[in-house]
Amino acid sequence: ICRCLVGSEMCIRDRYYIQKANRENFLYDLWDIDGGSIQYTHYEPGDYYTWHVDGDISNTFKPNIKPGSGVNISQDQVLQKGECVRKLSFSLQLSDAKDYKGGEVEFINSAGERYFAPKQKGTLIVFDSRTKHRVRTAKSGLRKSLVGWVVGPRWK
């Protein structure tokens, strides 16, 4: 477990839960968290993020990996394998649900069915990066989260 401070919030960044989610739900060929792309997000009243996907089969990029970062992929692998893709996305809820209204993370599947992520503080959601999702408009308070992506080789 690696603990990190984000402002006055204490969070736990633990690959264990992401690996477990992958084992139990996806079985994707993954390298690691793209550590250079983890983002602290906050939504104040009126803020939102429109419908989008974080990655698709045609969206490749060079990961932001620094030597000695603890990421389980070497720079040689990046150079040999070239580009990678975002395969899993994750969001760690940092705010208490009672501290804000609105700001729900909403998903939509290919059948048009909609789902909402839990809002409890400490909830980690892990989902396929090709899943269409959004953050609905924040109505009051402040919604805080950490979001990031797990990368791997191109889709086969």
Could you tell me what each predicted segment is?
Residues R15-K156:
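Catalytic core of non-heme Fe(II) oxygenases with the double-stranded beta-helix
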Residues I1-D14:
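Single conserved hydrophobic/aromatic residue that forms the stacking wall/gate
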